[in-house]
Every structure is written in structure tokens, then in C-alpha cells.
């Protein structure tokens, strides 16, 4: 943030996040990513847009970023929404410059790449702009668990399981699942055993019926 180039220095989590936010379109001068409080502003925005999603433990931007962390943050950037600014202009009167700075606005995507990453939301994700042949699709694995399949053109990159909201070993009451997930209304959930569909189960408050093996 001080403008110096130190190629042999370590890269902190905050510094790397600043680079990624810049790639998403955030303007350092407008967002306060320079000066004494730059790291606070960077960390706040990075966590707000989910660049640390999937990180084990808490984000510590003062520490040097590991290779694994760098890969995770860069991967999350692919899925993050880009931003742009409107009506940025300046006028100089008698040697004094007045600048009108707008706030960051999510970039719209009205093209054919909308929906390549995540749902079709009308917003431009980083990969939808710069990696137009990269796609993720919701699928299920051999055990009917939710997963994501990544492809580049016609080539399959891989299928990866989604992280479960809750995991149990052995039997569990449907009412306990309801409580553990902080649900507010009952749900008729699809139920599979080793990939084979069973009867739907009512996940609702106080249901003592057990599922699992």
C-alpha cells in the first residue's frame, strides 16, 4: 500500500486481497485501499464479498499468505461479482480540483455468459468476463450428494462435492436436523441411501423419526 516494489518480500493476506479486489474492479483511491487504514478497508470488503469462503479458521491478513490460501482466494475471485463506477469526473476551478466519485456498483451481465458461474443472476462474475468457456453446473455424485461439475469448453475439469451444512455419524432424529439447521418451517426432504432414492422425509420440529444407518 506504500507504493514500493519488493519482489523478494512476503505477500500478506491483506496485500493479496487488495490485488484481487483490484481485479474485480474496486478502485483503491475511492475505496480507501491506500493510507494508514488500507488493510482494514481491504479486509472488510474482501470478507464481505466472500473471498475467504472455505478458509479453515479466521482470516488473518497480517500473516503471509500460504499457497493453499492464495489458491482459495483466487478461486473465490473467479466466482465473485465484478464492479464498476459511474459518473466519476473532476472539475478544476481557480487551481482547485473538485472530484465527484461514485460508489462501486455491481457490473451487469446481459450477454450469453450469464449463468456460466452460479445462477443466471444478470451480474458479471469475474470468470464470466475473462474465462468465457469456464462453467460450473450443479450435479450430484454417485451417492446423490450435491456437487459441482466444472468444465472448460467440452473438457471436464472435475466434479467436487459441496460442503455439507451438517454431518452425522449413525442415526439421527429428523427433529434434531430441523433444530441443528435452524429451520423455521418444515421441509419434505429427498432421502437417499448409498445413492438409492427412498421415500421423502418430513424434516420438522419435534419429529422423533430417525434416519441414517
Predicted regions and their residues:
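Long, low-hydrophobicity ectodomains and other hydrophilic envelope-associated domains
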Residues: 160-211
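N-terminal propeptides
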Residues: 1-180
Amino acid at each position: 500500500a506504500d507504493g514500493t516494489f519488493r519482489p523478494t518480500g512476503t505477500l500478506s493476506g491483506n496485500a493479496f486481497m487488495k490485488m484481487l479486489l483490484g481485479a474485480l474492479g474496486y478502485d483503491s483511491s475511492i475505496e480507501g485501499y491506500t493510507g494508514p487504514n488500507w488493510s482494514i478497508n481491504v479486509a472488510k470488503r474482501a470478507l464481505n464479498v466472500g473471498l475467504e469462503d472455505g478458509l479453515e479458521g479466521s482470516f488473518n491478513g497480517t500473516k503471509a499468505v500460504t499457497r493453499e490460501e492464495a489458491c482459495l482466494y483466487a478461486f473465490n475471485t473467479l466466482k465473485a461479482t465484478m464492479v464498476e463506477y459511474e459518473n466519476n469526473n473532476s472539475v478544476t476551478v481557480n487551481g482547485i480540483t473538485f472530484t465527484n466519485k461514485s460508489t462501486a456498483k455491481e457490473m451487469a451481465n446481459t450477454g450469453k455468459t450469464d449463468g456460466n458461474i452460479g445462477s443466471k443472476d444478470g451480474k458479471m462474475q469475474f470468470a464470466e468476463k475473462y474465462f468465457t468457456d469456464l462453467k460450473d453446473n450443479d450435479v450430484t455424485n454417485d451417492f446423490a450428494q450435491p456437487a459441482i461439475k466444472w468444465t472448460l469448453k467440452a473438457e471436464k475439469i472435475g466434479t467436487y462435492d459441496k460442503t455439507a451444512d451438517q454431518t452425522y455419524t449413525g442415526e439421527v432424529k429428523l427433529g434434531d436436523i430441523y433444530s441443528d439447521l435452524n429451520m423455521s418451517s418444515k421441509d419434505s426432504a429427498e432421502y437417499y441411501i448409498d445413492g438409492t432414492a427412498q421415500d421423502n422425509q418430513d424434516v420438522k420440529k419435534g419429529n422423533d423419526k430417525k434416519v441414517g444407518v
